[in-house]
Amino acid sequence: MVTNRKIFELLFLAALAVTAAFVISAFAAEAERATLIRGESLSSSAGANAQKIVQVERGSALTILERSQADGQPWVKISMAMDQQAQVSREVTGWLPAKSVVTASTANGDEIIFGQGVDSERQAEERGGRKGAAQDALRLYSRVPEMFPGSPLAAEGMWRAADIRWQLAKTDFVRSGKPMEEKYLREVIAKSPQSKQAELAAYDLLDNQLCPEWRGLAECPTKESALYEQYAHEHPQSPKAAEALYNAAWRQAALTDIYRINNDRSKSDAARQKGIALAQQIQSQQQDQDWKMRATDLIYKLEKKIPVYGVDVVETGETK
């Protein structure tokens, strides 16, 4: 039989549970997202002379826990995942100088973080640029849609982060053969359909359908030419439309040489005409002058029967 005392204890415990859940929920709601725009050492306490725990890189995902003053400067206590790339990682807490921290409430915070992403991306492209700058740019761009989902820069930040991740994966694929993860590019397409960023993401995804090597056979360039042509026709307003048409035309030019080497003149002539037609679409439909000039060059080579596939190809169909 349940006594009144027992009922009271149960009600008291239930009230405690509800209160705890409310406190946790309130803390989660108040926890402020933040990131760094320069690398800093995480300290065990506020102050320049405190013990250093770990180096925190640009663009790391942070949660503000507390604020304080030390050495006449503002400091923030933060929580962060030790491994920023892992889905599950040990959390570490410590103190950072507040001057390098940008939060979701920082005025123009989205532009500041995005701008540091652009700077890091440029560093990655420069000879002798900062080590790890590409990963910095990836993290910084990722923070923009996470911290400022309503920002005009959110879609572009998501796309640039996904593209950098993809380019790094391509380098790793060439070295190790590790498959490239499509998830982040597909998120761009899902969250910003019909946008410029979605069209660029769709173009990147074509990489996973290309052959690692042609081995002088017609199958791969035939398939790849069709892929690029289909993309150009499905995404006529894409910034990559002209490039896609050129890639389709160039592969037809390569097929012209492959079939000629195999003494299949009818297929060689058909590929030549197809290549010319695709290149002419660039001249008539696209505005990018660089791709127009490249199309003109390719048409000239096709009309003059100048080989484009392999520098050692000669007109007899033999190799030097």
Task: Indicate where each model-derived feature is located.
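Bacterial N-terminal signal peptides that target proteins for export
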Residues: 2-14
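Boundary regions of SH3-family modules and the immediately adjacent low-complexity/disordered segments
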Residues: 79-123, 164-167
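Short coil/turn linking the two alpha-helices of tandem helical-hairpin repeats
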Residues: 83, 117-131, 162-174, 206-218, ...
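Helix-turn-helix repeat elements of alpha-solenoid scaffolds
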Residues: 129-142, 174-184, 217-227, 268-274
